[in-house]
């Protein structure tokens, strides 16, 4: 899990937009690399469908003041196996937009407890699905 820069005790997985011409797996890998500098990964699985959450009213008000009009996010989820070392992680590789300032290794089923409330349901679905895949994958390596 990664701690969001500029927010006290807010944790999440890397995420971001899909550029024109990218598929969502390529976008997921690019965002992981841009936000954490992690390159030593192997794609393991993807969640079978996009998942959506809506922003709560307090977040929408902040967005409105910033000129943003989106009301939620639709996300595609990918599971990567990190086969590098912790010294690969670097949050300042793209200093123009630092997303994270901390990380911690956790059991995947702990992740839903650490995210903001409006993301919890999506994280619970994704983490429950990926937990089974992780157990099988680890048994093979």
Positions of the model-derived regions?
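Tryptophan-centric aromatic hotspots in well-structured domains and transmembrane helices
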Residues: 11, 48-53, 77, 100-106, ...
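Active-site micro-motifs of SAM-dependent methyltransferase domains
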Residues: 9, 34, 113
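N-terminal strand-loop-strand
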Residues: 1-14, 39
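Functional cleft and adjacent loop/helix regions within the main domain
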Residues: 14, 20, 61-65, 140-141
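Charge-dense polyanion-binding interfaces
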Residues: 128-141
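NUDIX/MutT-family hydrolases
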Residues: 74-81, 88-122
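Active-site-adjacent beta-strand/loop module that shapes the phosphate/pyrophosphate-binding cleft
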Residues: 51-89
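The catalytic Nudix box helix
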Residues: 13-49
């Amino acid at each position: 899990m990664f701690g969001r820069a500029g927010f006290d005790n807010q944790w999440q997985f890397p995420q971001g937009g899909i550029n024109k011409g990218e598929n969502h797996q390529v976008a997921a890998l690019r965002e992981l690399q841009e936000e954490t500098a992690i390159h030593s990964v192997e794609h393991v699985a993807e969640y079978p469908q996009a998942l959506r959450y809506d922003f709560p009213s307090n977040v929408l008000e902040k967005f409105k003041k910033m000129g943003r009009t989106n009301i939620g996010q639709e996300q595609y989820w990918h599971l990567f196996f990190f086969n590098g070392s912790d010294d690969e992680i670097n949050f300042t590789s793209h200093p123009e937009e630092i997303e994270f300032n901390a990380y911690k290794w956790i059991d995947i089923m702990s992740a839903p407890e650490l995210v903001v409330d409006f993301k919890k349901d999506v994280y619970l679905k994704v983490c429950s699905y990926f937990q089974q895949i992780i157990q099988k994958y680890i048994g093979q390596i």
